[in-house]
């Protein structure tokens, strides 16, 4: 299982893409690596995702800051928004928390849509606290936000 967050967005050899199970760039990385002018909305995220799938990636999830995230695996596509009333204090570890939530979902054998939701919820918890290590969500915090948001 290969989960790849391409930060920073440096050129990736085309032959490497076929080994990636979950490719999770942010909007800027998706734009840079796809060659598209912008990846600012769901339509553009789908365009970028198709480019990565054409290169061999199995699933793409683009994190889209305060918009949420977009995922496409060649069969299903989902745009998941963030829960209401998330107050951003520090976004320094949001991507890392997203990856952790996604990984938790994968380890639990969840469906694709739930993987994106797990990542979004984890990132939302992280941005509400300052710092990197201290902002990583606990299971208790994760479960609480999951229940509160209904996701």
Region locations from a protein language model:
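Conserved beta-alpha-beta core of the PfkB/ribokinase-like small-molecule kinase fold
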Residues: 1-47, 67-69
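Conserved phosphate-binding/catalytic region of the ribokinase-like
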Residues: 11, 15, 42-151
